[in-house]
């Protein structure tokens, strides 16, 4: 049963009438451009064919009722006429409440709604299940009440909800690619202007995501530390963000910077340059160059930004040894575990899956999870 069928049938069963709309918003994988988004830089993600799906309908009153199908049909209910506050015991509820609260703060006029939510974006893997949920909820109210919001505004609203209501500092990339993704394309995003450029993916290329299943523990605290180090670097150069610092300017005075901050800055500057070049390599179908750029990105995350772990490095080595110069592989996401992403010819997928299955667990004691994805369409009706 598809997510659409599941949420529609559950909606009718629980609420006693049929849903009028079913909305989907995808998860994402970032092909290259890591920890550049909050430095006003460039990222190159694609939406993937794992998504959050919501069947919904308007209500005549000012109540919002939500059923989380993936959490034993837990219920949340709140009024649009009372201050929307965080839910103490149901973390998933806060993503919904936060999005609705921030839609209100943007002076959108809308009434109540019934929602049934289900999704298949792997959670805790760095594939943006939370952004997918935020964008799906924003799109629900936009569609039900014809709100004058475009995809970028729905994305910004989701980011605000996550930063200010849920209390997690995130850049704009995850929400933006979920809202604006394009089938068979990656999206080069300028995180300062929110300008996007669709980059066609070469035919016959698979997007493979492998979850290391290494339990991420440091990600929250270390993420904030990295962010502070980048801001320190920008202040040193008297610039609003590292986006405004050239590599030449950095190299001229790198020795004057705190050595750790210097490494963090170098990663961001070189990663921005790699990301812009990667978009052009991908468009030309130059998988060899794309692979080189992904390898440089991984080395930079490992050595300069210091956000990889041995398990992730092992996965990258296994995949790289199998695909050679026919594609690329790197860690993707915030770091300290999570996933690697690989671009490779579809014909090589079985060999990569076999190599990882025989070597990764033997070397690390952990069993991986392997996903083959298609670059997919952003949020909308399904």
From Swiss-Prot:
Residues binding ATP are 124-130
Question: Which GO BP terms apply?
Answer: galactose metabolic process
Keyword set includes Cytoplasm: yes
> Its pathway?
Carbohydrate metabolism; galactose metabolism
Q: Where is the active site?
A: 174 (proton acceptor)
> Which PROSITE patterns is this protein grouped with?
GALACTOKINASE (PS00106), GHMP_KINASES_ATP (PS00627)
Q: Which UniProt keywords apply?
A: ATP-binding, Carbohydrate metabolism, Cytoplasm, Galactose metabolism, Kinase, Magnesium, Metal-binding, Nucleotide-binding, Transferase
EC number of this enzyme: 2.7.1.6
Q: Which SUPFAM superfamilies match?
A: GHMP Kinase, C-terminal domain, Ribosomal protein S5 domain 2-like
List the record's Gene Ontology CC terms alphabetically. cytosol
> Does RNA-binding show up as a keyword for this record?
no
The UniProt record gives the binding positions of Mg(2+) as 130, 162
Reactions accelerated catalytically: alpha-D-galactose + ATP = alpha-D-galactose 1-phosphate + ADP + H(+)
Which enzyme class, named as a word?
transferase
Q: Which GO terms describe its molecular function?
A: ATP binding; galactokinase activity; magnesium ion binding
Q: Which residues bind substrate?
A: 34-37, 223
Q: Where is this site: Transition state stabilizer?
A: 28
Name the InterPro entries on file.
Answer: Galactokinase, Galactokinase_bac, Galactokinase_CS, GalKase_N, GHMP_kinase_C_dom, GHMP_kinase_C_sf, GHMP_kinase_N_dom, GHMP_knse_ATP-bd_CS
Query: What is the predominant subcellular site recorded for this chain?
Result: cytoplasm
Family of the protein in this entry: Belongs to the GHMP kinase family. GalK subfamily.
- Role description: Catalyzes the transfer of the gamma-phosphate of ATP to D-galactose to form alpha-D-galactose-1-phosphate (Gal-1-P).
- NCBIfam families attached here? gal_kin, PRK05101.1
* Protein name per UniProt: Galactokinase
């Amino acid at each position: 049963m598809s997510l659409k069928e599941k949420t529609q049938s559950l909606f009718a069963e629980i609420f006693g009438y049929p849903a009028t709309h079913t909305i989907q918003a995808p998860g994402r994988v970032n092909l290259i451009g890591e920890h550049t988004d909050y430095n006003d830089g460039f990222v190159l993600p694609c939406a993937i064919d794992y998504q959050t799906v919501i069947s919904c309908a308007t209500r005549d009153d000012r109540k919002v009722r939500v059923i989380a199908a993936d959490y034993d049909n837990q219920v949340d209910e709140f009024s649009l006429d009372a201050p929307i506050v965080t839910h103490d015991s149901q973390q998933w509820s806060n993503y919904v409440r936060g999005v609705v609260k921030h839609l209100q703060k943007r002076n959108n006029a809308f009434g109540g709604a019934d929602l049934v939510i289900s999704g298949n974006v792997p959670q805790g893997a760095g594939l943006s299940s939370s952004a997918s949920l935020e964008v799906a909820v924003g799109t629900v109210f936009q569609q039900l009440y014809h709100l004058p919001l475009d995809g970028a505004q729905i994305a910004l609203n989701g980011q605000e909800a996550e930063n200010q209501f849920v209390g997690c500092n995130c850049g704009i990339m995850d929400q933006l690619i979920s809202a604006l993704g394009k089938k068979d394309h990656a999206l080069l995003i300028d995180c300062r202007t929110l300008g996007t450029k669709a980059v066609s993916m070469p035919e016959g290329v698979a997007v493979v995501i492998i979850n290391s299943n290494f339990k991420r523990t440091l990600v929250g605290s270390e993420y904030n530390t990295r962010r502070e180090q980048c801001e320190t670097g920008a202040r040193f150069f008297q610039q609003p963000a590292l986006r405004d610092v050239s590599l030449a300017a950095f190299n001229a005075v790198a020795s004057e910077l705190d050595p750790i901050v210097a490494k963090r800055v170098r990663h961001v500057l070189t990663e921005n340059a790699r990301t812009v070049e990667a978009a052009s390599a991908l468009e030309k179908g130059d998988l060899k160059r794309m692979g080189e750029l992904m390898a440089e990105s991984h080395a930079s995350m490992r050595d300069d930004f210091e956000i990889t772990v041995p398990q992730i490095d092992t996965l990258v080595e296994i995949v790289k040894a199998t695909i050679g110069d026919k594609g690329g592989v790197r860690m993707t996401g915030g770091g300290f575990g999570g996933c690697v992403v690989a671009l490779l010819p579809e014909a090589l997928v079985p060999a990569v899956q076999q190599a990882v299955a025989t070597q990764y667990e033997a070397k690390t004691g952990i069993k991986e999870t392997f996903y083959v994805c298609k670059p997919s369409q952003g949020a909308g009706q399904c």
